[in-house]
Structure formats: structure tokens, C-alpha cells
């Protein structure tokens, strides 16, 4: 009984420390871009050479890029509060049927929470922390800031983070110089930017579908 009590207290203490740290950092990130994210650290530990992100202000990110990422990743981004219970339920049912975690059902806010603070493995513990973290992000940040941080810190190539660095890596020029076709290719590959590039996305059926969805949007 004493062991169980100590375990509960330890767990509560760890959660309090984690969410407290997330709250403080999120308040800072409301005004300052994070110099490093959890995903960057994980990639470094995997031996990937991480390149510095090149953050862009929200107003300088092409309008099509912002609208397209919401269209592809999170249709209800502007109306939900960080977590979509329906999507989580569907993902849970699919995972139970498969016998393993295959789908995440994550919103853009949850993906940002994972990239900033958590680890990339598909685990129910991480999903629970991700949901709680997303609620903090939605409480302390505006939707514009969440989308800005997301686009500036997701991976767009091996160790390449942010839409500006991703554009330079994939096309050799800044994102504001890209046309709609190039932006569609760039955003189509974010499901697996380590294995695929804008030149090889046709080798992946899902990425090809995402690309043509944007081109016909």
C-alpha cells in the first residue's frame, strides 16, 4: 500500500512538474520563437544533423500555405479547442482493431504540442500528455500564433525545420518565391519528410493524394 501511495505521489509530482514547465514555456513562446524543440533534440540523438530553423512572422507566411495546411491536417482548426474527441475516438477504434497504435487523430495544436515538448513514438501515454499540452497551448496562445509556430517548427526534410528552411532545402529558394504547385508539393510531404521529398512524393500514394487534393482545391 505504501509503495502504491508513493507511486501515485511520484506520478502526480511528475505531471505537475511537466505541465508547469509547459505552461511557463508556452507563455514565453507566445512572444519568442523556441530556439530548440523536443523533436530537434530527438533527431540529434538519432544522429541527424539538425539545421537551424528560420522562423517567419505569421504575416510573411504565404496565405495559401496557411490555408492549405489547415485543409490537409485539421479542417476544424479554427473552431476546436485543441483536441477533437471525435477524431481521437475514431483513431482509438482503428488502433484497437489493428492491435497497435497506427492512427493518432491529432489536431494541428496536438502536433505542435508533440513537436515542442514530447517524443515522436506512438504511445497512449504520449497521446494523453499531448492532449493536455494542447489544451494549455490553446489557452495561452492565439490561433494565429499556434499556426505560426506549427509551420515554423515542423520537419520538412532530415533535420530541416520550418517552412522557410524547408522551402530552401527542397527548392533552393524562400517560401515566398514558391508558386501554388510548389507549395502544394511542399505541404504534401510533411507526413514523412525524411523518406520522401518534393521530387519523390509520387512514390507514396498518400502524399500523391494530398498533392492532387491541393491542386484541385
Segments predicted by a language model, with ranges:
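Juxtamembrane regions of bacterial inner-membrane/periplasmic proteins
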Residues: 2-217
